[in-house]
Amino acid sequence: MLENENQLTHQFPTLSRWNPMFISDVHKISFHPHLQRYIGFWMGFPIRWIQIVGYIAAIDIYEGKHVLTVDDCSGMVLRVVFIIQDDFSMSKRAISMSPGNVVCVFGKINSFRSEVELIAQSFEELRDPNDEWKAWQKRMRYKKNLTKISKNHHSIIRTPKKSYFPKDHAKELLKCIRQMCKLNVQAGFTIEELIIYLKAKELHLPLVHIFNVENEIVENCDGNHILALNFSLQTLLQHGRIVRKSNSVYMLVTSKDIIRFVIPLMASGLLEAHKVQSIVRDSNPMFITLPLSAIAKHICQFLLRTKGKWRQAKKYTWVRDNQFV
């Protein structure tokens, strides 16, 4: 039984590494409606990040995104999506390619309209034919090794019986934590205190869907069970809703924790989330886990409440609008 995503990643290195795959195998990835659309299963292993190599068969331009259709001669093609807002320069470089160019693409799988596509994270053009051949051999070896591992449950990568993907549970748990900590946020809380609070208030969290990897059956876990609570706490940690004060003590992250570092920077007329993130992390080691997206959310909500008019210049960057000054 897995207690958190770190353990899941330890049991399944395929979940956190780049997996070199043939496009025909990418289309064999299965998704489950109760799991995140960015996580699928291939040969019994959970998978998120993949690497493909092939030639560009088509280039399409849409509002907000560019799409390359890539063919690796394995029998199928794959849509590779470049989100303009995420990386403008990479998206621009992608459409500067020509059909027939061979590219190596790293990306995150996505279930879209019952099909699998790749959300590009990075890519490069392969000009040397030997590189394409080496990439083909690399995929053959990787698939062969995974096939051996999947047949041997005593190998380094062992198939756990169950993996957990709470969604609504984490949201409801966060509401309970906020209510529990509203009198003294800085004191923090332990999972034992959380269980006692839920019992005292007779609160019942929603069931957590449990996907049994071996038989592909979705089971349910009681929302107040320590296993469900542990995994949802890890989810809240990843999204920057809480931080660790110590190994067993968590603390709720509030807007005040972030905004006190934002206000001194406002005089310059420029706010950059990554700069605020750096200052916040330097202020206290426990904030090291705060992701950029969480910092940006607090900044955005604060700017909406301020009298001065600010506008978003680009992702995670805001400037004061001079016409309102």
UniProtKB/Swiss-Prot annotation:
Localization annotation: Nucleus; Chromosome, Telomere
Residues annotated to bind DNA: 50-126
GO BP annotations, alphabetical order: telomere capping; telomere maintenance
GO CC annotation terms, alphabetical: chromosome, telomeric repeat region; CST complex; nucleus; telomere cap complex
Pfam families registered for this protein in UniProt: Stn1
UniProt keyword annotation of Cell membrane present: no
Annotated keywords: Chromosome, DNA-binding, Nucleus, Telomere
InterPro entries with a match to the protein in the record: NA-bd_OB-fold, Stn1_N
A single GO molecular function term of this UniProt record: telomeric DNA binding
Entry function: Required for telomere maintenance.
Subunit structure, interactors included: Interacts with ten1.
Name of this protein: Protein stn1
Organism annotation: Schizosaccharomyces pombe (strain 972 / ATCC 24843)
Lineage per the UniProt record: Eukaryota, Fungi, Dikarya, Ascomycota, Taphrinomycotina
Gene (name only): stn1
